[in-house]
């Protein structure tokens, strides 16, 4: 495996993780707004 492939895989993983965190945050925020 080349270094470039490793970097791309790591970048993809980090982006996926960021998207998941953002979705979790938005879902949490929406839930709090609905509870008011």
Curated annotation (Swiss-Prot):
One of its GO terms (molecular function) is hormone activity. It comes from the Eukaryota. The keyword Secreted applies. GO terms for biological process: neuropeptide signaling pathway. Keywords: Amidation, Hormone, Neuropeptide, Secreted. Its main location: secreted. Bag cell neurons. The modification Lysine amide is found at residue 36. GO terms for cellular component: extracellular region. It is found in: Secreted. Pfam families: ELH. Belongs to the molluscan ELH family. ELH acts as a neurotransmitter locally, upon neurons of the abdominal ganglion and as a hormone by diffusing into the circulating hemolymph and modulating the activity of other organs. It specifically causes contraction of smooth muscle in the ovotestis and expulsion of the egg string. This is Egg-laying hormone.
